[in-house]
């Protein structure tokens, strides 16, 4: 699946992701750069709506739900990271790759 196809699928899936509490979604890594191999995973960065009142295990479960929703839509193994949990150095490293979806 090309980068443009992934972006289109994620935009189509946005209502379901928003229903799960996702307020922002971006992709990064090899799929965002366009140099992914067939076996590359899809790296996503998410923000959860603070009004969703998700904490602890409920938040971890939601992240898993988001990954499964994206995997079902794209057919690509997905790894979701919470934007607020990433280290500043990691944020700097992925900044050039980052493509905001919504």
Where are these regions (language model features)?
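A short, structured beta-strand/loop element
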Residues: 39, 43-44
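Short hydrophobic/aromatic beta-strand micro-patches
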Residues: 45-49
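P-loop (Walker A) phosphate-binding loop of NTP-binding proteins
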Residues: 30
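Catalytic core of pol beta-like nucleotidyltransferases
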Residues: 1-24, 33-34, 38, 51-102
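Conserved histidines in hydrophobic membrane contexts and catalytic metal-binding motifs
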Residues: 27
